């Protein structure tokens, strides 16, 4: 047995081998050490002919999935080695084979997977400075392929699909991409595969064979090179791990990565699209607000929509038309939602059916779902919007399959497939006969006994049974002259003879073998039904996608109606004009409609950048996020929380909101912030929407102000970037840029002062804030009065008047200089800001500054010295 184990393990060295022994899956050697540690199970030992006992541990077969999922969730590959012959009939060692390999991206356990999101596996091939990318979810049949020209866009695709597993060629693995960051921050397991997986000819042939086509033109892949290699390598990997023909992968969809709005991981987190930033929960996210879907398929599709907003105006309008019609047709919509409610996850059910793992209850769940389709289609037939008409056409009621399952499968079958009671009475004559034999055998024997007495005239004829002869007819010697010729003698006794007849033999076979035959026949018929359903996988998948899309549009329509959303107008002119916009999540979290609505106006001309000032806690971040979310919702195809909204299409949304130290990579808060800013400035376009909060706060005031100022100038210049931007800052000096840079406008959060206290009005108004109210916010936060009072004294001594004046002077100077035809390079813009902090040529002040013993000064001594030197300079200037 151990020899067999070692031979199997040699073939799957990168896997933990679950080796079936009776009622347990056993692990040995290093696998046992790893499994016992990760699963927290007892480690024992086994004699295997070596000097030391082999480490061993095991898990019961009936609970294997929970242990399996725990290992897979930690990034391990697990090979399942099953007994493939009956131990009772085996000669020698029972034959065993690996029947599947489970990895994070190939887990088929629907109980362990989140039904509201896809479980993607991605294959990346790096060849000649291009990336071939393919993505599949084998639980739903999704299969996509594209080609990408640079690493930034590749990261966008990784963020968009959020795969649980990436397989790649060695060139990508060694390309310098931050693979550790993907593993740690995104939770992705990454494997580099052997070179033969990526052989061009092998990959191409795999795809042609699987999809049964003769050329790639029929697949839409004629112009794809490294994309085809990626898709072929992924298919080969899936075939090897699943050990089946992957018949639910019926289509491969090529796509252009530029079809959707790009959202990097920072933006997805900061906008809390699908989960909250802190708790990592759905409640409190945008998806939580929008998701009123009734089916798992609909929930997954809505999540895709939220994570992949459209950038094509026609496609957006089609979605909005569908939502509009279902919003207007409220009665029909609620009827549809009522019929959608009992529909199970058709995509993952058909996966189980095609892979042969569906149990009888899965088929009854499938039938229950199909029974809902005719009334859904009936209601849809009067809809007029293009997408709803398309859904109606694609929604095949599958009445033939529904009828087959209803007639063949018991109403309430067991989960087990080989314990009978699966096939419905009346479906198969042989099943009915065996079932009667199992339950009515004694009655049949009594009837046969009575019939034989009447036919032969043998009054004392008896049917008896023993283990040697089975059932037999016993006739006493006094009546043996009446025994007919078709009786066959089996045994002679002193006073009687024992006989069998063909009919009795048939009854015996039926009675004694009825249960075994019944269970075997029921299983055979069940698999026939299952295979008949599996053969229609393409019809079922098409219907599943239609049902999912309908569920999404009905959900968005319901949310729009309940939450008083409006249909956004979509424009391609770069204008974002929102009246009385509201944050979709925050307004649902606070009571009694207390949310304060605000307007937003941005365009590509004179309103490109809004500089927003105001105290902490006043609502700046909420306002900026709300604008981004409204723009995103519109491009998803959803109605939006506003009185009116005219949304210009954005190709990307970037957010730079908050930061913390990245201890794992040794980066400070400021370094994290600057890295994010650099990413935005490199990858944003003039069609992007930027949400920037407190740029430059992680360093000294002067450095921070310089950087923030330079960033505003860079973004505002259409020759450099020219993106629409909401820019929140505590550097009130930046408000001087309004009027100096023609497309910069000031806004602030209105505040009402009551003595030393303040009230946040949450209203965005024109103009800049004259102070930050930091001391008042500190008071609201509960800072001790002693500290508050001292802070008031210090703030009166510190004046920023000179800084503000110098900002105005430099901005004016820059405005004049920019009239020259030469375009400044970005590093020149940086250098220009340094004039704000030019050294004052007062030798005595410089000398005193040089001689200060900074290391031994208290904070208050430092402040007093700064104040004294500042006054000295004021008097001279």
Model-derived regions, located:
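C-terminal tails and terminal domains of large nucleic-acid-associated
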Residues: 835-877
